Amino acid sequence: MTLLHQLTLSDAREALMRGEITSVELTDALLARIAAVEPQVRAFLTIDAEGARAQAQAADARRAAGDTSPLLGIPLGIKDVISTQGVRTTCASKMLENYVPVYDATAVARLKAAGAVLIGKLNCDEFAMGSSTENSAFQQTRNPWNLERVPGGSSGGSAAAVAAGEAPATLGTDTGGSIRQPAALCGITGLKPTYGRVSRYGLVAFASSLDQIGPMARTVRDCAIILRVIAGADPFDATCTDHPVPDYEAALTGDIRGLRIGVPREYFVAGMQPEVESAVRVAIDVLRDQGAEVREISLPHTPYALPVYYLIAPAEASANLARFDGVRYGLRVPGESYFDELERTRGAGFGPEVRRRIMLGTYALSAGYYDAYYKRAQQVRTLIRRDYQQAFEQVDVIAAPTTPTVAFPIGAHSDDPLAMYLEDVCTLPLNLAGLPGLVVPCGFAAGLPIGLQLIGRAFDEETLLRIGDAYQRVTDWHTRMPDLPVE
């Protein structure tokens, strides 16, 4: 018998539509699951049990009145860098520990309009800067498959909550792999949409030319359902395009015959675990067996993506985080003068990784270094984008690893920032090019999940979702859940 916390989003939706369960019953079951496993997983920073029950009751009343909204009565979690009206939004930082937004992010407002029940806010690396959720100022989220391992980051809480059965789906954000990497490490499905597909209004910015909000869930179908709700033009975000939003769920036909899949040799990096490479190549063979045409391709500027990213992203972060000065909102530490107060506030409010990236970014933008570093990085970014454009003249989708290894032990990279940055070597090129990426579970090594990454043309999430769904129709990796101790 499937327990309520084991239901996928689409299964829960069907059960609600058929009247087999109510939203109140589903919400209570998930709150009970959170109470049972949260002491071990620690995915949530804020649990809004009272608000969730009230929303669930309202959803049941709407359904009784004939409402058929696509997410009516479905409980979801939200990464804690996305603004939620009346619910604390901390960015996992002491700087915003007590900040309560007075408005919803556009993505959250659209979820609410579609009937979703917001159950709480999820842990992440501070201001979304990290690959392990170890940079949170408040707690360490643990990988539900092995509580001594990281869940990935920065959307580690969003991934762990889905894997642990605390929520059927969540919202995460992806600046350099922060949806896809934790999805792979926690054995769930995650989608980074095309830059400009989903409004960033209400997202606390890390790197404005790279950030994107996207869904994390158990299945590709679940991600398709959520994407259709949150995608589309927004007058509050000038970078969000009016590109037509298709019916993504209708695109899940299961037929991928004739689709051309490229496998880039540069993504199989030195130091990749053999088990990871093997699982990814076996997954690609499954797609070939389903009728796809597979060929090797080259993305020659991929090796430069990591240094380019770590010039551009910190530069944008240093500008975006300048607003946290202790004057208007957030933490304020008194000082003898304005500059002393500013130094004390930012020193106490920001953790070491955030301070490191602000310093990197400020250096890259400073006089005398701008042309040598930041401007040159933007030029190489154009070459990386051009690599993808040329590749997509030959293929429809690119298939590659998501991470070079499975989840590493908590603390393994704490004293080695470069080793931590290398965890994103397979994911961050997409952000530089603004392309969509989908991760689906494709195997295990030493009891830890492995993810296959699918990369698509700009605004062609349909094809990505179609291939990912076809893969999940003939495999069962996405159906597996960890056996967690409960309290």
From Swiss-Prot:
Signal peptide: none annotated. Gene3D superfamilies: Amidase signature (AS) domain. SUPFAM superfamilies: Amidase signature (AS) enzymes (SSF75304). One of its GO terms (biological process) is translation. Keywords: ATP-binding, Ligase, Nucleotide-binding, Protein biosynthesis. One of its GO terms (cellular component) is glutamyl-tRNA(Gln) amidotransferase complex. The keyword Chloroplast does not apply. Its EC number is 6.3.5.7. InterPro entries: Amidase, Amidase_CS, Amidase_dom, AS_sf, GatA. It comes from the Bacteria. Coiled coil: none annotated. Pfam families: Amidase. It catalyses: L-glutamyl-tRNA(Gln) + L-glutamine + ATP + H2O = L-glutaminyl-tRNA(Gln) + L-glutamate + ADP + phosphate + H(+). It is an enzyme of class 6 (ligase). HAMAP family: GatA. Belongs to the amidase family. GatA subfamily. Allows the formation of correctly charged Gln-tRNA(Gln) through the transamidation of misacylated Glu-tRNA(Gln) in organisms which lack glutaminyl-tRNA synthetase. The reaction takes place in the presence of glutamine and ATP through an activated gamma-phospho-Glu-tRNA(Gln). Heterotrimer of A, B and C subunits. This is Glutamyl-tRNA(Gln) amidotransferase subunit A. It comes from Roseiflexus sp. (strain RS-1). The lineage of its organism: Bacteria, Bacillati, Chloroflexota, Chloroflexia, Chloroflexales. The gene is gatA.
